[in-house]
Amino acid sequence: MSGIPFPAIDPVAVELGPIVIRWYALAYLAGFLFGWWYCTRLARAIPGRPTPDDLSEFLTWAIVGVLLGGRLGFVLFYNLDYYIQHPLQALAIWSGGMSFHGGLTGIVAAILLYGWRHGFSPFALGDLVAVAGPVGLFLGRIANFVNGELWGRPAPDLPWAVIFPDPRAGGVPRHPSQLYEAALEGLVLFAVLAWLASKPAVRERTGTLSGTFLVGYGIARILGEVFREPDVQIGYLAFGVTMGQILSVPMVLIGLWILVRAPFGPVRTPAAAAAGR
């Protein structure tokens, strides 16, 4: 049995007395900042709203939606029994424990509320967020690897298997599934969405990019979970599937529905923007 020893990476990026900043927190910060920059860049190329000013205002909504939704999703989907017994711990977001599907629900709620409040289609905003989202996912998965958490299933004969230092990993070589997910959910999905967003006919058809993100992420997550060790407090569910796979199936179905309806939805052309559509 071989395996690559986990590199000696300190999960703490900066420590100044009582102030401790982890790479995981910096990954979130970098993801939000990149998302804001990239979305405003896209918004300038698409007529109508949301405008770059809208996106600057929406940034706060996005941060709140992702953090609250991500934490609530982790509490409800992954460790509900524990938090029923220790309810105050649900507020300790700094102690770790975030759910992508919860964060997605939170930002979708923020998109719907912001679009409704400002009088434009939430799909127009969702399309921009969808293109930038995979970069945040990539950074988050890299931070998971740096933290030595969410490791993969045992793979004693895999040449690139990693031996994670956490005693709960059992000292056996495992798939570096965080890196697989960083590639699939992050790099590959971003490349596809950025290419589609470069096509005026695609980016002006509201809903196409949102639907593609949901389908693409759902498939990538279902595949990535094949190599990822399930959360110990949940394990495998019915028929050997994981919670992450179950939560990803509705994403794919909703994404397909959005893609089917997108050709019949509004088009963000200069003429449509001038007409106030």
UniProtKB/Swiss-Prot annotation:
Sequence positions that bind a 1,2-diacyl-sn-glycero-3-phospho-(1'-sn-glycerol): 141
Pathway where this protein functions: Protein modification; lipoprotein biosynthesis (diacylglyceryl transfer)
Top-level taxonomic group: Bacteria
Places the protein is found: Cell inner membrane
TM spans (from-to): 16-36, 58-78, 93-113, 119-139, 182-202, 207-227, 239-259
EC number: 2.5.1.145
Keywords, ordered alphabetically: Cell inner membrane, Cell membrane, Membrane, Transferase, Transmembrane, Transmembrane helix
PROSITE patterns: LGT (PS01311)
Name of the top EC class for this enzyme: transferase
Alphabetized Pfam families for the sequence: LGT
A GO term, aspect molecular function: phosphatidylglycerol-prolipoprotein diacylglyceryl transferase activity
GO biological process: lipoprotein biosynthetic process
Role noted for this protein: Catalyzes the transfer of the diacylglyceryl group from phosphatidylglycerol to the sulfhydryl group of the N-terminal cysteine of a prolipoprotein, the first step in the formation of mature lipoproteins.
Family, similarity comment: Belongs to the Lgt family.
Matches recorded under HAMAP family: Lgt (MF_01147)
NCBIfam families: lgt (TIGR00544)
Protein name according to UniProt: Phosphatidylglycerol--prolipoprotein diacylglyceryl transferase
Source organism: Rhodospirillum centenum (strain ATCC 51521 / SW)
Higher taxonomy: Bacteria, Pseudomonadati, Pseudomonadota, Alphaproteobacteria, Rhodospirillales
